[in-house]
A protein has these predicted regions:
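Short, surface-exposed, charged amphipathic helix/loop patches that serve as local interaction elements
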Residues: 7-10, 14-80
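Short acidic-hydrophobic surface loop/beta-edge motif
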Residues: 1-7
Length: 80
């Protein structure tokens, strides 16, 4: 798990999921299957997706930004 900051709050994400090919494929295919995106949120945020959605205001677009921040945090960890 990695910890990262978004909108002044601390969040955790599963770094292993964020760097997994199957997960990346599911994200890219989410346009064809909307449920895939929700499964991805659940996987990345270790089941805390609804809690995190409430913490960031409940908007899907903001959850997308949170997911992007998680990817960036995983990338920063991989560089170190």
């Amino acid at each position: 798990m990695i910890t990262f900051e978004f909108d002044g709050k601390q969040f955790e994400a599963d770094e292993g999921v964020l760097t997994d090919y199957e997960f990346i494929a599911d994200i890219l295919e989410a346009d064809d299957e909307p449920k895939a995106l929700i499964r991805c949120f659940k996987a990345v945020f270790a089941g805390k997706d609804r809690e995190y959605a409430r913490a960031v205001g409940g908007k899907m677009a903001t959850m997308g930004d949170l997911l992007k921040a998680a990817f960036e945090a995983a990338g920063d960890t991989a560089k170190n």
